[in-house]
Design a protein with these regions (language model features):
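Extracellular beta-rich repeat passengers
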Residues: 43-78, 90-100, 105-106, 110-260, ...
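Gram-negative bacterial Sec-dependent N-terminal signal peptides
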Residues: 1-41
């Protein structure tokens, strides 16, 4: 496997002066506009075992995820306003299917999930004083798995039509044993309720496990429409910002900037909506995946096999999207069996194309685009 840099180098040139300076100042502007500022916490609490009973994390502590931590089925994790989770390399949080998470941040007291290296730059423990750094991959991510319909054809026993028995293993997670159910998502409940996220900032995270096997900033697998996500920020993630696999979950008020691959990635039949977004793509001299270069702003895919259902029929509203000028990267990339609508969105500074059709499986994505089906 090719080695992956943990740094996020950025090119300096007049062409990218606006984006470069926007990146430098976006910690302040983005967090202020979204209300993502707040007070720091006190003593550190190491978290080294899975969460098997309902648990509350308070803003009087900081929490250090030591390894891959699961919220197990039947358990609920509640995170109070103003709580800071500051982890070492390798720390990540995954909410298994059948568990719930409630991130109860507010405009004045957001929940911050970041690295200990980030917190070390805070003066007096105040996150408003943090220094933006050209870095990523300093901890893992937040993954939430649910019970909604997905279209996934590589799992033995899955079928081509929507089925409650279809499931998949979540990208980037490690099984404790073969067939570990805690890494699985998908089912037959499009009203799945895996909890809620309100005012959450995810910073300096992500992990490239292997080719096409990464931890995104926020990974959502098979979540239903009863799951609520409102006001979330992803900054400096080494892979995608947000990736959604199937389900019907909706999102409002999202900010994604300076990530190493796609900002907003969709797969396996997502049928939800996203509204009020800001995307600023990462830019680097090194165009390899996971190095800090942004790929597509939006990448939309359906089933891995285009005969499989449900297809991706999502909608994006009121997004401002700033790309980066690397050839081969698109403001929107369309792959097989994805039919996404964009309403009242502004796209600027794209790479090769504003709309790019990737006919990877040879089953007509380009044709669907040109004949108006999409």
């Amino acid at each position: 496997m090719e080695s992956v840099s943990t740094q996020v180098p950025r090119k300096t040139s007049p062409k990218n002066f606006l984006v470069k300076n926007l990146i430098k100042g976006i910690t302040a502007t983005s967090l202020v506009s979204m209300g993502l500022v707040g007070a720091a916490s006190a003593g550190e609490v190491p978290v080294s075992i899975n969460i098997a009973t309902s648990t509350t994390w308070t803003n009087t502590n900081t929490y250090n995820l030591q390894g891959q931590i699961f919220v197990l089925p039947g358990a609920t994790l509640t995170i109070e306003p103003g709580t800071v989770i500051a982890s070492d390399v390798g720390g990540s949080l995954a909410v298994s299917k059948g568990a719930q998470i409630f991130v109860n941040g507010t405009q004045n007291q957001p929940v911050i999930m970041t690295s200990k290296a980030d917190v070390a730059t805070w003066i007096g423990g105040d996150p408003k004083t943090g220094t933006w750094r050209e870095s990523a991959n300093e901890w893992g991510n937040l993954t939430i798995m649910g019970d909604a319909f997905i279209s996934e054809d590589s799992t033995p026993g899955n079928v081509a039509t929507p089925s409650a028995s279809n499931f998949a293993a979540m990208e980037g997670l490690t099984e404790a044993f073969p067939g570990d159910p805690n890494v699985l998502y998908g089912g037959g409940n499009d009203d799945d309720d895996s909890g809620s996220i309100n005012y959450l900032s995810l910073r300096y995270g992500g992990k490239v496990v292997s080719l096409a096997n990464e931890l995104n900033g926020l990974s959502l697998g098979g979540l239903g429409r009863a799951t609520d996500i409102d006001h979330v920020e992803i900054m400096n993630n080494v892979d995608d910002g947000i990736e959604i696999w199937g389900g019907t979950v909706n999102l409002k008020h999202f900010s994604i900037w300076n990530v190493g691959d796609d900002s907003f990635d969709v797969d396996q039949g997502w049928r939800g909506k996203a509204q009020f977004g800001l995307i600023v793509q990462g830019y680097s001299l090194n165009a390899s995946q996971g190095s800090g270069v942004g790929d597509n702003c939006f990448e939309t895919d359906g089933a891995e096999d285009s005969d499989w259902q449900p297809v991706t029929t999502a909608a994006i509203y009121n997004a401002t999207v700033i790309g980066q000028p690397i050839d081969g990267d698109g403001l929107t990339a369309w792959r097989d069996n994805a039919r996404v609508q964009y309403h009242n969105c502004v796209f600027v500074d794209g790479g090769e194309k504003a709309v790019r059709f990737d006919d990877l499986d040879g089953d007509g994505a380009q044709g669907y685009g040109h004949n108006g089906t999409l």
